[in-house]
Each structure stands twice: as C-alpha cells, then as structure tokens.
Amino acid sequence: MQERVKTKKIFVGDVAIGGDAPISVQSMTFSKTADIGATKAQIDRLALAGCDIVRVAVSDHEDANALKELKRLSPLPLVADIHFRYKLALIAAQSVDCIRINPGNIGSKEKIKAVADACAERGIPIRIGVNGGSLEEMFEQKYGATPRGMVESALYNIKLLEDFGFANIKVSLKASDVERTVLAYRELRPLVEYPFHLGVTEAGTLFHSMIKSSMALGGLLLEGIGDTMRVSITGELEQEVEVARAILKYSGRQKEGVYLISCPTCGRIEADLVSAVKRVEERVKHIRAPLQISVMGCAVNALGEAKHADIAIAFGRGDGLIIKKGEILCKLPEEELVDRLVEEAEKLEREYLEDSFKN
C-alpha cells in the first residue's frame, strides 16, 4: 500500500478533509429536501450508521428555503447539491456547510463567480463535481466522455475559482464505470493540491455497486489517493455507509472495527460454518476496536490463521477451540463457541478502549 498523498486540508462543517485528516464517509438523502421531517429522519439514520457528511438535493426554491431549518436540525455537516440553477446555490450558501456544483450544467463564468463569492463570504468550500455523463460541451466535443475530458473540465473550473480568488475547493471526477473513474483521478492527482472526493456515479444496486466501488475506490485508496468518499447504491441509505467503511477497512485506510476472516468451506468441515459466521458477523458489528476475528471450519488452516487473529474459532466434530492471540484458550461444545468468541472479543475491545484512554 502506497503512502497517502498529502493534500490541502479544508473543512466541511467540523469535519476535516485532506491533509492528515481521516478519510470521511459521505452519503445523500433521497427524500424531497423540502420535506424537512422525512429528510431529517434520513439524516439521523445516516448518522447512526456512521456517516460523516450528508448531501441533499436542491432542485427548487422550496428545497433551498428548507436548508436553514435542516441545518439547525442536522447532526451532520450539510452539503447542497446544485445542478443548472446557480441562484439556488446562492440561497443554499447562506445555510449549508458546502456547495457541490456540476460544471457541466451550472452555467457561465459569471454564474460560477457569483457562487464562489457567496461561498467565500461564509467561508464554506465548493466541490467541483465533474461527472463523466454531463461534461461541458467544449470538453465533450474535444475529448468525448473520457478521463481526459473529465480532467480538463476539473482543471478549467479549478482555474476559474482560483482566478476569482477562491481556493476552498475539493474535487470529484465520477464516471459510471471503474476504468474511467480510476484513470481520471489518477491523471489529476499530481496536477492539483486539493482534496479528492472519491466515488463511482450511478453504480447500481448493492451487488453491482459493491464490485464497482471496491475496485475503483479500493484501488485508488491503495494508491494513496482519496480524502473523502461516497459509495453510490440504488438501495438503503445505511448500505452506502456500511460498504464505504468496509472498503476503508480492507484497504488499510481505517483502523477501526472487526476484520473478519472465515474459510470458504470444504468437505472436511463437520459444523454449520455458514450459520456460525453469519451469527458472529451480526454480533460483532458494534465493536469499534480494530480486532481481527477468525472463524475456521477445521484445523487445517485454523491454527495458522489464529496466529494472526486476536480471537478465533476452530471447529471440530461437535466441538471446537477458542484461540486467543495465538494460544488455545479452551475447548467447548459447538453450540457454545460463538457466544464465547463474542464474549472474548468484547473483553478485547474494553482493553483497547482503556489503553486508548490512558494514552
């Protein structure tokens, strides 16, 4: 894994993005923003799921005028998503923590300057949200919907904002496929110092989005690219946050939560491993300590994996071993193994939290 690229640090509300700040997770509500009750309920769900920043669509004046009250109620920093109607950004900038503009449809230089001035007055950032499906006509005609076209759009709009004296910027270059997304971010990275918002747009339902996002976002994170991210899923809000956190964890960019290892099963297994793994997965969701937990169906790989695990199960015939920090802790009947594993994992979390508090 490459060292993370150092970028300029900005703030969306109280959440730092870039520099040495942790990589934050974002999501977006799907209710009509003007329906304050429904939108607040979705924001609360995202906050409970572990989201750091939430974006809301601003499609009309009714949405824009709801932002002041939403900002007052929201437990998370609020980003206004603006397309086409720049005047909505001017209203939104009075309340929210960040404005996202799509350079492909926001309009003329004068309109972008008006948005920049409104954001500068309040000290909030602008995300230049380039989308491969809606490039400005001049870049679409010259480059097509290619990574180069996306990069040129980003550079052009960054230069515009800088010429207006505005440098409180973050950038995204999203396409609906893995290759264009990765190539665009990779090409732009050495050319600018601004933080990157990672994402694959229109990524599809849970299964398809997990594959696309893991490949694109996980690959970029391993290259050291990325400061904040959203996993786009046609599905439940919480899924976006859960998948994003998993990508951060398994790419090594987030040292929090359980890293679960389990074998794929084979003819040697004499226990209901699939059921056991599902029960373990569900019961350790709440653990925030960076623990490695291994659930293995037989002794072939169990002892080797357990050497690297904080706590492990090695199933046998009707019973199994609990292995803690590479040492056999006890042998128990099969039906008691999951309970004991969870109990020991929670002990390890308490020890981790106590040590963290002391330090």
UniProtKB/Swiss-Prot annotation:
Assigned EC number: 1.17.7.3
Can you tell which superkingdom this protein's organism belongs to?
Answer: Bacteria
* Gene Ontology annotations of biological process type: isopentenyl diphosphate biosynthetic process, methylerythritol 4-phosphate pathway; terpenoid biosynthetic process
Residues the record lists as binding [4Fe-4S] cluster:
C263, C266, C298, E305
Gene3D superfamilies xrefs = Dihydropteroate synthase-like (3.20.20.20), Sulfite Reductase Hemoprotein, domain 1 (3.30.413.10)
InterPro entries found in the cross-reference section: Dihydropteroate_synth-like_sf, IspG_bac, IspG_bac-typ, NO2/SO3_Rdtase_4Fe4S_sf
- Keyword 4Fe-4S in the entry? The reply is yes
Cofactor: binding comment = Binds 1 [4Fe-4S] cluster.
* Sorted UniProt keywords: 4Fe-4S, Iron, Iron-sulfur, Isoprene biosynthesis, Metal-binding, Oxidoreductase
Annotated metabolic or biological route of this protein: Isoprenoid biosynthesis; isopentenyl diphosphate biosynthesis via DXP pathway; isopentenyl diphosphate from 1-deoxy-D-xylulose 5-phosphate: step 5/6
According to the UniProt entry, its GO molecular function terms are: 4 iron, 4 sulfur cluster binding; 4-hydroxy-3-methylbut-2-en-1-yl diphosphate synthase activity (ferredoxin); 4-hydroxy-3-methylbut-2-enyl-diphosphate synthase activity (flavodoxin); iron ion binding
Tell me the function of this protein: Converts 2C-methyl-D-erythritol 2,4-cyclodiphosphate (ME-2,4cPP) into 1-hydroxy-2-methyl-2-(E)-butenyl 4-diphosphate.
What's this protein's family per the entry? Belongs to the IspG family.
HAMAP family cross-referenced by the UniProt entry: IspG
Q: What is this protein called?
A: 4-hydroxy-3-methylbut-2-en-1-yl diphosphate synthase (flavodoxin)
